[in-house]
Amino acid sequence: MSPGPRLLLPAVLCLGLGALVSSSGSSGVRKRGPSVTDKVFFDVRIGDKDVGRIVIGLFGNVVPKTVENFVALATGEKGYGYKGSIFHRVIKDFMIQGGDFTARDGTGGMSIYGETFPDENFKLKHYGIGWVSMANAGPDTNGSQFFITLTKPTWLDGKHVVFGKVLDGMTVVHSIELQATDGHDRPLTDCTIVNSGKIDVKTPFVVEVPDW
């Protein structure tokens, strides 16, 4: 793993087609967007205080390889993964970043396919707060690091692979966001994923997005 931050962003700014899915809500209005096929959870502790659970919906019909990687790292089924790792980079009103379970500083991590794997596609965008995307060190360098958006960073579209959306636990995400950080955007208090895993999705459901 080459040195340097996995997520390359300007300092001033700080980074097979999935089937068209539509469904009708209780009002009868058809919802259009990607379908959640899988869910994972992160139980988070800040310092010595358990602050709650983040639940992330994943879009396996759009980015199946990226989702497979994320789920396997959440469950630890390959013998390594997110459990015990930290959110090592936090920038208020922008994003929180985690997933470096080897170096814990943004220079490490690995995928289930090897050290890195290529960008799958950029069909999903950074639509707003709570979207989950792969951190990288340039094109085709996805590993295990990811970030959760705290704004609508459209300048990252086409550069980072979006694969999920926070469905529950944004209060936990904001608790991490509000932590004091050092000069390298690292929280002064460890924000740890103390447990992680998969939640079964019996019936896929749509997350509505514009222009889908």
UniProtKB/Swiss-Prot annotation:
Keywords: Cytoplasm, Isomerase, Rotamase
Gene Ontology CC: cytoplasm
Record PANTHER family: PEPTIDYL-PROLYL CIS-TRANS ISOMERASE (PTHR11071), PEPTIDYL-PROLYL CIS-TRANS ISOMERASE C (PTHR11071:SF11)
GO biological process terms, semicolon-separated: protein folding
Organism taxonomic ancestry: Eukaryota, Metazoa, Chordata, Craniata, Vertebrata
Top-level class of the enzyme under EC nomenclature: isomerase
PPIase cyclophilin-type domain sequence ranges: 41-198
Family statement drawn from the similarity comment of this UniProt entry: Belongs to the cyclophilin-type PPIase family.
Activity: how regulated: Inhibited by cyclosporin A (CsA).
Reactions mediated catalytically: [protein]-peptidylproline (omega=180) = [protein]-peptidylproline (omega=0)
Molecular function terms, GO-annotated: peptidyl-prolyl cis-trans isomerase activity
Gene that encodes it: Ppic
Organs and tissues of expression: Specifically expressed in kidney.
InterPro entries the UniProt entry points to: Cyclophilin-like_dom_sf, Cyclophilin-type_PPIase_CS, Cyclophilin-type_PPIase_dom
Function: PPIase that catalyzes the cis-trans isomerization of proline imidic peptide bonds in oligopeptides and may therefore assist protein folding.
Protein name: Peptidyl-prolyl cis-trans isomerase C
Location in the cell: Cytoplasm
Mitochondrion as UniProt keyword: no
Keyword Manganese appears in the UniProt entry: no
Superkingdom: Eukaryota
EC number(s) given by UniProt: 5.2.1.8
